[in-house]
Curated annotation (Swiss-Prot):
Family per similarity comment: Belongs to the dGTPase family. Type 2 subfamily.
Protein name, per record: Deoxyguanosinetriphosphate triphosphohydrolase-like protein
Matches recorded under Pfam families: HD, HD_assoc
GO terms, molecular function: triphosphoric monoester hydrolase activity
Classification via PANTHER family: BIS(5'-NUCLEOSYL)-TETRAPHOSPHATASE, SYMMETRICAL, SLR1885 PROTEIN
InterPro entries assigned: dGTPase (IPR006261), Diverse_Catalytic_Enzymes (IPR051094), dNTPase_2 (IPR023023), HD/PDEase_dom (IPR003607), HD_domain (IPR006674), PHydrolase_assoc_dom (IPR026875)
Residue intervals of the HD domain: 76-204
Entry keywords, A to Z: Hydrolase
Length: 400
C-alpha cells in the first residue's frame, strides 16, 4: 500500500459520509496525470497552488490599503492565509476534506488584479463589451491556462473538485455565473461552501482590525453601534479580560477581532451541523442537490454581520484616503490598458504573441486584462512611471 492509498483509506474511515473523498475525485479533467505515491490528489493541488508564482505575487497585492501606504496592513496573501485557516477550522469540526478546503482557499483570489476591488471594477468596465472581468472566473483562467510550470500543458492541471470550488466561489459581493462545466449540481461541494463563508468572515474581521489600527475607526464608535453581534463581542471581551477597556488600541483590536472570529466560527459550525441533521444528509450527492447552501450561519447572526460590513463600507472604504487610493489605482490601470491597446509592441514576450494571435479586438483586450491582472501593485506602479514619467529609467526586466 502506498502512502497515498493509506491516506485515502484514512479519509474513508475518518471523514463524514457527505465529505468529498480524494479517492472519488473526478480527476484531472483538463490533462491526464499519473497519481502521486505519497499525496492525495487534493494535497497535490494544494501544493501546486502554494508553489505557483501567482500565489507568491499575492503578497504584493492590495486588500484595502495600497501596499506602498504601509507594510502593516493586510495584503491579498495574508487574507488568503486567513481564509484557509477559517476553512480548516470548519472542515475539521464538520469532518469535511481539509485538503480540498485548503486548496480552494489558496486559489480563490489568484485572479484578483492589483488595487483590490477598484482594480477589478476598472478591468470589468474596460471589458464591458467583451464579457467583462470577474476575479473568480479569472482565478480559474489562471490555474487552467495562464500559470506556467509544466512543459506538457498550460496551467496547474488541478482536479475537477478544486476547479469547481474556484469557479463557484460565491459571496455577498461575488456572484459569478457558473461555467457550464460545473452545472451538474445545484450546489457546490460542502468544501467549496466552507470557503465561500470563510472568505467574508476573514475579510470583515481583518479589515476591522486594520481600520482600528490605522485610526479610521475608534473603539468607542464600535461600542456605540446598535448591533447585537458587536455588543455581544464587547461583553465577552470585558468578561474575559477585566482590563480590556484600559488596554491600548492595538491590543484591544486584536482581542476584539479574535473574539469576533470565535463567535462567527461557533455560529457557522452549529448552524451547519443543524442543517446537516435537518436535511438528513448522508452523501455528497444529497448535499449537492439541495435548494440552498448547507454551510451557513444563523440568519440573525448573518444579518448582524452584514450590518457590520455595511458599517465598515461607510466608515472605512469611503474614507477620503481610501477613495483617493482607489481612484489612483483606477487611473493607473485604465491609462496603461489604453496605451498598450494602441502600442502593443510594448507588451513583453508571450503576451505580445497572444495579442498578435488573438482573432479579434475582444480577444486582444482579454490578453491585456490577463497581463494587467497578473501584475502586483508595485509592478503596475513602476510600469506606469516607466511609461509616462520622462525621467524614469526603463532598463529593467519585463515580467512574462
Amino acid at each position: 500500500m502506498t502512502a497515498r492509498e493509506f491516506l485515502e483509506a484514512t479519509e474513508k474511515e475518518k471523514l463524514a459520509p457527505y465529505a468529498t473523498r480524494s479517492a472519488d475525485s473526478a480527476g484531472r479533467t483538463l490533462h491526464g496525470d499519473e497519481p502521486d505515491d505519497y499525496r492525495t490528489c487534493f494535497q497535490r493541488d494544494r501544493d501546486r497552488i502554494l508553489y505557483s508564482k501567482v500565489f507568491k505575487d499575492l503578497q504584493h497585492k492590495t486588500q484595502v490599503f495600497l501596499i506602498n501606504e504601509g507594510d502593516f496592513y493586510r495584503t491579498r496573501l495574508t487574507h488568503t492565509l486567513e481564509v484557509a485557516q477559517h476553512a480548516r477550522t470548519f472542515a475539521r469540526a464538520l469532518r469535511l476534506n481539509e485538503d480540498l478546503c485548503e486548496a480552494i482557499a489558496y486559489a480563490h483570489d489568484l485572479g484578483h488584479p492589483p488595487f483590490g476591488h477598484s482594480g477589478e471594477e476598472t478591468l470589468n468596465d474596460l471589458l464591458k463589451d467583451d464579457g467583462g472581468f470577474e476575479h473568480n472566473i479569472q482565478s480559474l483562467r489562471v490555474v487552467d491556462f495562464l500559470e506556467k510550470r509544466y512543459q506538457r500543458y498550460d496551467g496547474l492541471n488541478l482536479c475537477f473538485e478544486t476547479r469547481e470550488g474556484i469557479a463557484r466561489h460565491n459571496t455577498t459581493h461575488d456572484h459569478p455565473d457558473t461555467p457550464p462545466e460545473f452545472q451538474n449540481y445545484s450546489q457546490a461541494s460542502l468544501e467549496a461552501q466552507v470557503v465561500n463563508i470563510a472568505d467574508p468572515l476573514a475579510y470583515c474581521a481583518h479589515d476591522l482590525e486594520d481600520a482600528l489600527n490605522a485610526g479610521y475607526l475608534r473603539m468607542k464608535d464600535l461600542r456605540n453601534m446598535e448591533n447585537p453581534l458587536v455588543r455581544r463581542v464587547f461583553e465577552r471581551c470585558s468578561s474575559r479580560y477585566p482590563d480590556f477597556l484600559k488596554a491600548d488600541t492595538v491590543l484591544q483590536s486584536r482581542i476584539l477581532v479574535r473574539t469576533l472570529i470565535e463567535e462567527a466560527n461557533i455560529a457557522v459550525i452549529r448552524q451547519t451541523s443543524r442543517n446537516i441533521e435537518l436535511y438528513g444528509i448522508s452523501s455528497v450527492e444529497e448535499a449537492r442537490s439541495l435548494p440552498e447552501d448547507v454551510v451557513a450561519a444563523p440568519a440573525g447572526v448573518w444579518k448582524n454581520f452584514d450590518a457590520l460590513k455595511a458599517y465598515l463600507f461607510e466608515n472605512v472604504y469611503r474614507k477620503p484616503q481610501v477613495c483617493i487610493m482607489n481612484e489612483k489605482g483606477k487611473l493607473i490601470i485604465r491609462r496603461i490598458f489604453h496605451h498598450l491597446e494602441k502600442r502593443p509592441e510594448m507588451l513583453p514576450g508571450i503576451f505580445k504573441t497572444r495579442f498578435d494571435e488573438a482573432a479579434d479586438s475582444s480577444g486582444k483586450r482579454r490578453v491585456l486584462a490577463d497581463y494587467i491582472s497578473g501584475m502586483t501593485d508595485r509592478y503596475v506602479m513602476d510600469l506606469y512611471m516607466m511609461m509616462f514619467e520622462p525621467y524614469e529609467k526603463v532598463m529593467f526586466e519585463f515580467r512574462e
